[in-house]
């Protein structure tokens, strides 16, 4: 005898009618059990020698919100240069090899900009978006979220030294 098809909506209604009731406001909007949110934004270009463009660099603010036990702070803000991201990637690859996690692949960073217009607003914003996507990809990996000391230091330490 064929079973009657029930759409998801009718199944949901039958569950709710069996004493489960409507979910409360706090259940709907409660903090997730474990979360890690990372944003790379607010790029700033620095001219260390006053008006001389030699030595100019751009850094980016990384904001992290988390309740994961491997992190020491629930909210952290740090500023990082592109070279810091490069060093972080190298340290992360080394940590992964030492922990023998062959299935963790660290993606490549967005390409280094060698053009003379690397400090234009459009180029800086394109890089920021690339670094944001890259950082979310790396931080979104479950093994790295729960076990990477290098990731925690990069996100939380005022100065990243590996």
Curated annotation (Swiss-Prot):
It is found in: Cytoplasm; Golgi apparatus membrane; Prevacuolar compartment membrane. Belongs to the sorting nexin family. Gene3D superfamilies: Phox-like domain. SMART domains: PX (SM00312). It is a peripheral membrane protein. This is Sorting nexin-3. Required for retention of late Golgi membrane proteins. Component of the retrieval machinery that functions by direct interaction with the cytosolic tails of certain TGN membrane proteins during the sorting/budding process at the prevacuolar compartment. Binds phosphatidylinositol 3-phosphate (PtdIns(P3)). Keywords: Cytoplasm, Golgi apparatus, Lipid-binding, Membrane, Protein transport, Transport. The keyword ATP-binding does not apply. A 1,2-diacyl-sn-glycero-3-phospho-(1D-myo-inositol-3-phosphate) binds at residues 81, 83, 112, 127. PROSITE patterns: PX. CDD domains: PX_Grd19. It holds the Pfam family PX. Monomer. Interacts with RBD2, YIF1, YIP1 and YIP5. GO terms for cellular component: cytosol; early endosome membrane; endosome; fungal-type vacuole membrane; Golgi membrane; protein-lipid complex; retromer complex. Residues 38-161 form the PX domain. GO terms for biological process: endocytic recycling; late endosome to Golgi transport; protein localization; protein transport. The keyword Amino-acid biosynthesis does not apply. Transmembrane segments: none annotated. It comes from Saccharomyces cerevisiae (strain ATCC 204508 / S288c). GO terms for molecular function: phosphatidylinositol-3-phosphate binding.
């Amino acid at each position: 005898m064929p079973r009657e098809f029930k759409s998801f909506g009718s199944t949901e209604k039958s569950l709710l009618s069996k004493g489960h009731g409507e979910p409360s406001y706090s259940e709907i909007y409660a903090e997730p059990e474990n979360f890690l949110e990372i944003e790379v934004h607010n790029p700033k270009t620095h001219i260390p020698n006053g008006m001389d463009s030699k030595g100019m660099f751009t850094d980016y603010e990384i904001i992290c919100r988390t309740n994961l036990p491997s992190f020491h702070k629930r909210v952290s803000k740090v500023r990082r240069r592109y070279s810091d991201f490069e060093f972080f990637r190298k340290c992360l690859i080394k940590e992964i090899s030492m922990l023998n996690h062959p299935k963790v692949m660290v993606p490549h960073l967005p390409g280094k900009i060698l053009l003379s217009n690397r400090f234009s607003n459009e180029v800086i914003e394109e890089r920021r978006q690339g670094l944001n996507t890259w950082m979310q990809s790396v931080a979104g990996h479950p093994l790295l979220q729960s076990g990477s000391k290098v990731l925690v230091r990069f996100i939380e330490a005022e100065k990243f030294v590996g």
